[in-house]
């Protein structure tokens, strides 16, 4: 009797053990991708799909030139398979220190897991020489290239190439998703260019606060005639402001465009004195909760600019 009970107990134990055995999961763990900006993160998600888990260090409402380096950033970088930066010196004040502190050789410059998203972009405004008198000028050219939506394609290709380097087994997927993104982006760019003409933006003159909008202006046939900042990062003097107001009163300026992370008080005064509409524009994905994709960013830009142009035409 005791022998029977022992056998029964063993059978129950073995059965319970076997019932918990499951086949090994075949789904790969998503690659950890860390980007410096939300725009790069959005495009990385387009290319990587569910094979990536993407984190941006800079929030969409922050100035990407100046980001407080948090210890948590180093933890994220320590575990990253891929690091993607805007490059062209945009993050020079904060990203190199984080990369070195993270102690992850896989994502250092020159390693397979490092991506300079500008590597396939035709960069503009590269200075022939650099001096302190020029302010915070970027010696490697204007880094705000993502604000020409056509540049989303070379950005995506640079990210695709980086993903393939660190995960060659997913090359076919990354290639397909990149091609799909480029196709959809091409259709959207055509739509936005037509929209720029329809709302009367193309061919107009504008003043901007910072040199963030050079690529956007080139993409949509705008002429930037002056800046609130006389030089990048240098606050305007009273004389510069007065000269700017005089220039803007000539009546041929369509808009005063300003990035959403600068103090709006001076641009508001200039707009009041000149009658030129001030538009405060997002420069990045996730500038607010409704701008979730790269496509959303440009849809928002045109949705903000269109009524400002109408108000300017009435005044």
Please tell me what each predicted stretch does.
Residues 1-4:
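Positively charged n-region of N-terminal signal peptides that target proteins for export
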């Amino acid at each position: 009797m005791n022998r029977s009970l022992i056998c029964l107990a063993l059978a129950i134990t073995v059965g319970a053990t076997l019932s918990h055995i499951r086949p090994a999961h075949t789904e790969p763990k998503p690659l950890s991708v860390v980007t410096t900006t939300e725009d790069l993160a959005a495009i990385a998600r387009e290319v990587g799909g569910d094979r990536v888990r993407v984190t941006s260090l800079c929030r969409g409402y922050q100035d990407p030139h100046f980001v407080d380096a948090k210890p948590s950033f180093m933890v994220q970088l320590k575990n990253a398979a891929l690091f993607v930066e805007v490059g062209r010196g945009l993050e020079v004040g904060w990203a190199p220190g984080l990369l070195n502190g993270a102690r992850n050789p896989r994502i250092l410059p020159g390693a397979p897991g490092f991506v300079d998203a500008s590597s396939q972009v035709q960069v503009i405004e590269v200075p022939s020489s650099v001096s302190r008198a020029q302010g915070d000028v970027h010696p490697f050219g204007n880094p705000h290239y993502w604000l020409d939506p056509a540049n989303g394609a070379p950005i995506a290709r640079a990210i695709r190439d980086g993903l393939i380097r660190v995960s060659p087994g997913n090359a076919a997927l990354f290639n397909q998703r990149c091609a799909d993104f480029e196709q959809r982006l091409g259709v959207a760019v055509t739509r936005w260019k037509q929209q720029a003409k329809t709302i009367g933006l193309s061919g107009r003159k504008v003043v901007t606060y910072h040199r963030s909008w050079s690529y956007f202006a080139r993409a949509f046939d705008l002429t930037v005639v002056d800046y609130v900042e006389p030089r990048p990062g240098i606050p305007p003097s009273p004389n510069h402001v007065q000269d700017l107001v005089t220039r803007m009163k000539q009546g041929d300026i369509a808009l005063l465009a300003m990035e959403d992370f600068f103090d709006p008080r001076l641009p508001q005064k200039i707009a009041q004195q000149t009658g030129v509409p001030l538009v405060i524009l997002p420069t990045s994905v996730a500038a607010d909760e409704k701008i979730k994709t790269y496509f959303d960013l440009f849809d928002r830009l045109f949705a903000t600019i269109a009524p400002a142009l109408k108000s300017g035409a009435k005044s």
